[in-house]
């Protein structure tokens, strides 16, 4: 009975040969004492690899009096030659030209909801039917002129539609009213 009544402190201090040679478990990273010290002496903020100093350069497009209509709409209006060149590019890729116009808003807007990411003003009115089988850029330009005569205060855009993949591939503003 005397052997079973032993203090726990006596058991903890007892060690045999196997326990003395055990290595402590891994508890973290290696110490820096074994590695050479190489610190950067230049503390200039421009030398730090971070975009924190460049955040001031990023700006949001101002929505007041600078409406964005389509891709690259911040560029100057297309001349007649540039417009024909864009239409020829559209036709060369085999896309179907289609004209659309908008009499009130020539830009994306919210009208019936305030949900973020949803804009119900994305849809324009189609001018006639898509020009299936059209191979002449001047024919599309003539339709733009006809639409300008019918709606002089409307925005007119040309869409290139791929009827095989059933997607819109290109869209650009062909005419903006003088007020814009």
Swiss-Prot record:
<comment type="subunit">
    <text>Heterohexadecamer of 8 large and 8 small subunits.</text>
</comment>
<dbReference type="GO" id="GO:0016984">
    <property type="term" value="F:ribulose-bisphosphate carboxylase activity"/>
</dbReference>
<comment type="function">
    <text>RuBisCO catalyzes two reactions: the carboxylation of D-ribulose 1,5-bisphosphate, the primary event in carbon dioxide fixation, as well as the oxidative fragmentation of the pentose substrate. Both reactions occur simultaneously and in competition at the same active site. Although the small subunit is not catalytic it is essential for maximal activity.</text>
</comment>
<dbReference type="Pfam" id="PF12338">
    <property type="entry name" value="RbcS"/>
</dbReference>
<dbReference type="InterPro" id="IPR024681">
    <property type="entry name" value="RuBisCO_ssu"/>
</dbReference>
<keyword id="KW-0113">Calvin cycle</keyword>
<dbReference type="GO" id="GO:0009853">
    <property type="term" value="P:photorespiration"/>
</dbReference>
<dbReference type="InterPro" id="IPR000894">
    <property type="entry name" value="RuBisCO_ssu_dom"/>
</dbReference>
<dbReference type="Pfam" id="PF00101">
    <property type="entry name" value="RuBisCO_small"/>
</dbReference>
<feature type="transit peptide" description="Chloroplast">
    <location>
        <begin position="1"/>
        <end position="56"/>
    </location>
</feature>
<comment type="similarity">
    <text>Belongs to the RuBisCO small chain family.</text>
</comment>
<dbReference type="GO" id="GO:0009507">
    <property type="term" value="C:chloroplast"/>
</dbReference>
<keyword id="KW-0150">Chloroplast</keyword>
<dbReference type="GO" id="GO:0019253">
    <property type="term" value="P:reductive pentose-phosphate cycle"/>
</dbReference>
<dbReference type="InterPro" id="IPR024680">
    <property type="entry name" value="RuBisCO_ssu_N"/>
</dbReference>
<keyword id="KW-0934">Plastid</keyword>
<keyword id="KW-0120">Carbon dioxide fixation</keyword>
<keyword id="KW-0809">Transit peptide</keyword>
<keyword id="KW-0601">Photorespiration</keyword>
<dbReference type="InterPro" id="IPR036385">
    <property type="entry name" value="RuBisCO_ssu_sf"/>
</dbReference>
<protein>
    <recommendedName>
        <fullName>Ribulose bisphosphate carboxylase small subunit, chloroplastic</fullName>
    </recommendedName>
</protein>
<keyword id="KW-0602">Photosynthesis</keyword>
